């Protein structure tokens, strides 16, 4: 797509008129120049840091706004989508009518008309047979920078054949004046129309809405083709052994998959088809709160020119204070995946997964650091998706909150959770993969399990040193827990040992078990769910 006149006509078709200069797939140097211009004000303007990366602020929206997520309910989505207003569920897919959509679209297209625009064409998905060709349209340079970092950058030759089958229009500066009359949550919106294949953004500057919006779309299209869509990081060893790490934001997906002894496939979103595991993205979106070079060298060294920092505190001398959470706990950096040295090249994909790791951050101090799951327990804990929401990843979350997130990514699911569990199970059985629950949360004394111990546990899983050690059964949860792991202090393996009295653990465990049981009631009316009840905790 090099014909600007054709591009102008296409923008007109979208409803965007009288466009000024178009920056089409701008280089990083042009983006750097445009996002740091002295004439920019407010959230548009980036600050150059000593590390070389540009830092931007996103205002009050330092995380996603799930209550402002809307899907047009029409003939395509009516019977397939997992709706917020149907059944016993916690879906974020709030339905809107075509009429409301039309008003939101007018709001965004008017905002994007009569001004210079940045247009970025990119791929979502490393496999050509299942990827989306996505066009991003924004008036803000750093938002174009963000998607250039996060999605797969087409070659010049691929751009000549690029025909978008999904469009994202980011009108962060506009808000919806009629939201009360329309019965919506607020003046801000992140809306999708699968018939028109468009995403609209208004009112929120948070970059992650573009990233996670496309993830929700991949989570719709792929499982319907029997391709697993997974909220996970993934890496591969020298022998071609693939491991995937499921987990919500802040549980360790990015950190634990950045392993100097293994090649990174990707840090957050993947598919699993007949050929193996593949990345949806071309970049990483890592949390930076309390980031240090010694603990996370790969991520630290990725923060350089072309990386984009979000909501970090930049000191007067341009130094970044990664320990300062005054803006948000959810400080972030996006960077192209090649900023990590040890990556799968030239395409972010590998073979079938052999190790499936569910990461959970247990704020109760009940679960052990690691458990080898049976096939039935794998399904139960995948559908439960227990973790704690960590500070700042969503608007209003300021301290750890115990929660259940189906498939470790409930906020991004477009279909019913059982459909993802079914496809994942099929892929696991075909590949003879094993699953483990790894707790990166807190013990009974309120101390978080150290990254050193967690890395040693992951190492033992990957090298199959955990499969043949003695185990004990943890009551209530009926989990098989190893008594020893090489490189790990054995005292931390039994969560009861971190309490002065076992009955303290017992009380907390019973409390948490009741939460598991109550949460799983939403699946008990299905044949699969009823069979899995015995694979969870019992009182």
Swiss-Prot record:
GO terms for cellular component: cytosol. Binds 1 Mn(2+) ion per subunit. Mn(2+) binds at residues 212, 231, 268. InterPro entries: PEP_carboxykinase_ATP (IPR001272), PEP_carboxykinase_C (IPR013035), PEP_carboxykinase_N (IPR008210), PEPCK_ATP_CS (IPR015994). Its EC number is 4.1.1.49. It is found in: Cytoplasm. It is an enzyme of class 4 (lyase). Substrate binds at residues 64, 206, 212, 332. One of its GO terms (molecular function) is phosphoenolpyruvate carboxykinase (ATP) activity. ATP binds at residues 212, 231, 247-255, 296, 332, 448-449, 454. Its cofactor is Mn(2+). Its main location: cytoplasm. Belongs to the phosphoenolpyruvate carboxykinase (ATP) family. This is Phosphoenolpyruvate carboxykinase (ATP). It comes from Hamiltonella defensa subsp. Acyrthosiphon pisum (strain 5AT). The lineage of its organism: Bacteria, Pseudomonadati, Pseudomonadota, Gammaproteobacteria, Enterobacterales. The gene is pckA.
């Amino acid at each position: 797509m090099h014909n600007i006149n054709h591009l102008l006509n296409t923008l007109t078709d979208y409803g965007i008129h009288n466009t000024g200069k178009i920056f089409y797939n701008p280089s990083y140097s042009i983006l750097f120049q445009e996002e740091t211009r002295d004439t920019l004000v407010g959230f548009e303007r980036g600050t150059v840091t000593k590390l070389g990366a540009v830092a931007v602020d996103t205002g009050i929206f330092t995380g996603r706004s799930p209550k402002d997520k809307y899907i047009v309910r029409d003939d395509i989505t009516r019977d397939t989508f997992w709706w917020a207003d149907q059944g016993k569920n916690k879906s974020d897919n709030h339905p809107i009518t075509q009429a409301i959509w039309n008003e939101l679209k007018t709001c965004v297209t008017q905002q994007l008309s009569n001004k210079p625009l940045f247009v970025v064409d990119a791929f979502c998905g490393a496999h050509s047979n299942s990827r989306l060709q996505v066009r991003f349209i924004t008036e803000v340079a750093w938002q174009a920078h963000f998607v250039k970092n996060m999605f797969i950058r087409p070659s010049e030759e691929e751009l000549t054949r690029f025909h978008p089958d999904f469009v994202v229009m980011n009108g962060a500066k506009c808000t919806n004046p009629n939201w009360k009359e329309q019965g919506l949550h607020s003046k801000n919106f992140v809306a999708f129309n699968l018939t028109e294949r468009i995403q609209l953004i208004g009112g929120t500057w948070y970059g992650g809405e573009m990233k996670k919006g496309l993830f929700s779309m991949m989570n719709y299209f792929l499982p319907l083709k029997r391709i697993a869509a997974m909220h996970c990081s993934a890496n591969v060893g020298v022998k071609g052994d693939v491991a995937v790490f499921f987990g919500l934001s802040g549980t360790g997906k990015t950190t634990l998959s950045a392993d100097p002894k293994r090649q990174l496939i990707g840090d957050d979103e993947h598919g699993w088809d007949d050929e193996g595991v593949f990345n949806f993205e071309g970049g990483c979106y890592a949390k930076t709160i309390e980031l240090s070079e010694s603990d996370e060298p790969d991520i630290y060294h990725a923060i350089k020119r072309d990386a984009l920092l979000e909501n970090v505190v930049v000191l007067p001398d341009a130094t970044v204070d990664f320990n300062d959470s005054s803006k948000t706990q959810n400080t972030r950096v996006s960077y192209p995946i090649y900023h990590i040295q040890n990556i799968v090249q030239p395409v972010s994909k590998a073979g079938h997964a052999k190790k499936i790791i569910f990461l959970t951050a247990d704020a109760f101090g009940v679960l052990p650091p690691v458990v080898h799951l049976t096939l039935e327990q794998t399904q139960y804990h995948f559908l439960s998706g227990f973790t704690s929401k960590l500070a700042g990843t969503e608007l209003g979350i300021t301290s750890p909150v115990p929660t259940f997130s189906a498939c470790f990514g409930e906020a991004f699911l477009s279909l019913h959770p059982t459909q993802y569990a079914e496809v994942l199970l099929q892929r696991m059985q075909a590949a003879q993969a094993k699953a483990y629950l790894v707790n990166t949360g807190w013990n009974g004394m309120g101390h978080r399990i150290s990254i050193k111990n967690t890395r040693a546990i992951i190492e033992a899983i990957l090298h199959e040193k955990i499969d043949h050690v003695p185990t004990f059964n943890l009551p209530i949860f009926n989990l098989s827990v190893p008594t020893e792991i090489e490189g790990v202090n054995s005292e931390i393996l039994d969560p009861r040992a971190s309490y002065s009295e076992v009955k303290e653990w017992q009380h907390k465990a019973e409390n948490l078990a009741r939460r598991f049981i109550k949460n799983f009631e939403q699946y008990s009316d299905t044949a699969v769910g009823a069979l899995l009840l015995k694979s969870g905790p019992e009182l």
